[in-house]
């Protein structure tokens, strides 16, 4: 949760386009390791489920709508205590990014990290740089510095 930027009350949600796929992979015996073998499993499983019926996209959209657009369910009172609700969806494939951008009228942000880019080996990550993002942020420092920058970025965009 991010809150307290000046007088704005901001609630942040983070989702992953592969979150539901990870849950299914655990049920199928995945050990949770994000080594090359594990990343390839998740990437391949997501690809198959997308090709079959766009299941990862549909499930992520359902989750986003449940939490960020509450109606009669229990989170409504809690969420309405905030002035703004920000949703971040971690997705890497350009064609998938386009679907989320269209579905939610969203802005896109690429957080680049030279170390992570050097390790790109699976199908899902290969196309991440082949997209025209609305914003590009370089993360070549510590996680704490990235969090500070993110707070400033959110303040500038919301405030």
What are these regions (language model features)?
Residues 17, 91, 140:
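Fold-independent oxyanion-binding glycine-rich loops
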